[in-house]
Amino acid sequence: MRFDPEKIKKDAKENFDLTWNEGKKMVKTPTLNERYPRTTFRYGKAHPVYDTIQKLREAYLRMGFEEMMNPLIVDEKEVHKQFGSEALAVLDRCFYLAGLPRPNVGISDERIAQINGILGDIGDEGIDKVRKVLHAYKKGKVEGDDLVPEISAALEVSDALVADMIEKVFPEFKELVAQASTKTLRSHMTSGWFISLGALLERKEPPFHFFSIDRCFRREQQEDASRLMTYYSASCVIMDENVTVDHGKAVAEGLLSQFGFEKFLFRPDEKRSKYYVPDTQTEVFAFHPKLVGSNSKYSDGWIEIATFGIYSPTALAEYDIPCPVMNLGLGVERLAMILHDAPDIRSLTYPQIPQYSEWEMSDSELAKQVFVDKTPETPEGREIADAVVAQCELHGEEPSPCEFPAWEGEVCGRKVKVSVIEPEENTKLCGPAAFNEVVTYQGDILGIPNTKKWQKAFENHSAMAGIRFIEAFAAQAAREIEEAAMSGADEHIVRVRIVKVPSEVNIKIGATAQRYITGKNKKIDMRGPIFTSAKAEFE
């Protein structure tokens, strides 16, 4: 809270120790639900794949490569030019783009009657306007998502009525079937490189060093732990009349060394794609220490991580490219799996989807989901809660029956005296579980005493909810006393006995934590004898 510096300086000159000690009053005391760890500073996290993409971009730029964006939509004729006799096999794994045809819609007398029945009598002029908009749609002058607004604007009727009219009067719109085009989504970055390099030569002279990191699409038979139908390719090219296979080896080492790879093996690729010069297509195997001993088939530290080769003159000639081109590519997701210790590409890419990813909440995250249910709403109510806790701390071991005054003052316009009491004989003011604390430990939410037995559970302060049973009870008592003051009651007693569930001691668990604990067969265990009461007497 704010304070007056001049007054503080004056008071400090008169009595420094007193002023220093009273500095505590200048610091706001958080309410139970404002305590750490519920008060937290959240931070954004980059997605592992995009994080890896950014690191790859920086790595390529450091090596002197210039970034380029290649065409994503590629006509099948380009695939034939690039892959030759392999084109059909490549196209078999491509996604073709399709679109809905635009029907030639006629308006008969029967349909005119239906239109007038839905929109009201729009007359011959209105029907003619509908005809013109439908004709413009057929010719491609009006887009599909503009059809309803265009008719609505022409007739000055609501979009909802027009949409209803189209659905009921023109059922052919609902019966449209998509028709495939010759356009495909690229399955290899290579498809884009040929187009880009061929076009660039009209304006620039080689040598060129380019890289591109972008999506590719491949119609896999199924997705699994190592394959997705859409993935990111981190690809580069060097166009230079003197480029060789050794340039590919050098680029592989220079790029991958920046990600912790230490040793490299280069092996001829058995695939022998027709867009590469024979015997230049090379697989890159690299050693990464993070893989050693991992629970994967790469536990020896070695993994196939990239492929490079020299583009074939027969493919380059189709684009009038007169220079050799070295191309290297790697899958971003595979690299991201190594950097982020991910065993499954699906869970790495789509961690939010339950079928792909195990749900994990840390003890710290669970602790943030623990709250006090009823809390006082006035400053006086908060003072009452603090006073009840203070008396229980001072006199909790006192034998009963007993009563200790806790607070006296005015609440909601009424004078009140608050005491902590235990009327039963042969017990104590507070039961043995009164000072249990709420902690999360190994996925469980527990109410336990801070004793040697539970020492491990209290080592992580971020997993401690910062709530004791007695504090939650005192908050409920204070809130009920506020309500009693407003209702005109003469006396109000709040009791807590043996607690079996969190709600019996005024504690609630967030719905997310409850779902997680139920799904993981973990437990919420808050039990124990608290046995104390707070009494309010109003004047």
UniProtKB/Swiss-Prot annotation:
Catalytic activity annotation: tRNA(Cys) + O-phospho-L-serine + ATP = O-phospho-L-seryl-tRNA(Cys) + AMP + diphosphate
Role description: Catalyzes the attachment of O-phosphoserine (Sep) to tRNA(Cys).
EC number, as in UniProt: 6.1.1.27
One Gene Ontology molecular-function label: tRNA binding
Any matching Pfam family: tRNA-synt_2d
Protein name per Swiss-Prot or TrEMBL: O-phosphoserine--tRNA(Cys) ligase
NCBIfam families: sepS
InterPro entries the record matches: aa-tRNA-synth_II, aa-tRNA-synth_II/BPL/LPL, O-Pseryl-tRNA(Cys)_ligase, Phenylalanyl-tRNA_Synthase, SepRS_C
GO biological process entries: phenylalanyl-tRNA aminoacylation
Family, similarity comment: Belongs to the class-II aminoacyl-tRNA synthetase family. O-phosphoseryl-tRNA(Cys) synthetase subfamily.
Domain of life: Archaea
GO cellular component, one term: cytoplasm
Keyword entries, A-Z: Aminoacyl-tRNA synthetase, ATP-binding, Ligase, Nucleotide-binding, Protein biosynthesis
Top-level EC class as recorded in UniProt: ligase
Assembly mode: Homotetramer. Interacts with SepCysS.
UniProt: substrate binding residues: H188, M189, T190, S233, A234, S235, Y275, Y276, N327
